[in-house]
């Protein structure tokens, strides 16, 4: 906060005027905006070393700086030897956005070559739009019978069938031996089962 001298009355010859001190509220005695570093730099060695954001005043558009800051932090960080495979500390991987060549980019009128709105699609009459064949490959070979191979009037070879009940033989309708407490199998039991099988087989041909 600065102060300045203000005379109370006009000075007279040979008389020293009375002075009154008045307080000035302006910093550094000026009302102008302060010039800070990011946009302004002092005309010293430090200001010439660290240039402001506006760049060098003596270089025009398209001109390179005559002097390079070889000892600067930005230059040293850009020249740090790093690994491109990502094995070491501070390694660099591939470029995130690769430069696109102008020869590869599409030209005007390249898009929408085919107008899909004007196309008329044929309606499908297949259920659920399924037109795939039932069998992927046609069965053509000697192992597959051809037309006329089957004869529906031909009778198959007769086989012995037992009366079934829930997928198993119903032994209540088949002649069986009487149950005994002894689980040992006798020779008479074998003869009985053998005779029962023979009777069932001959009943196919003889009534």
Curated annotation (Swiss-Prot):
Keywords: Cilium biogenesis/degradation, Cytoplasm, Cytoplasmic vesicle, Golgi apparatus, Nucleus. The keyword Cytoplasm applies. Expressed in tissues rich in ciliated cells, such as lung, kidney, vas deferens and testis. Both isoforms 1 and 2 are expressed in testis. InterPro entries: CIMAP3 (IPR033602), SHIPPO-rpt (IPR010736). Interacts with proteins involved in ciliary transport, including ARL13B, CETN1, KIF3A, RAB6A, RAB8A, TUBB1 and TUBG1. Interacts with AURKA. During primary cilia disassembly, involved in cilia disassembly. Required specifically to control cilia retraction as well as the liberation and duplication of the basal body/centrosome. May act by stimulating AURKA activity at the basal body in a cell cycle-dependent manner. This is Ciliary microtubule-associated protein 3. It comes from Mus musculus (Mouse). The gene is Cimap3.
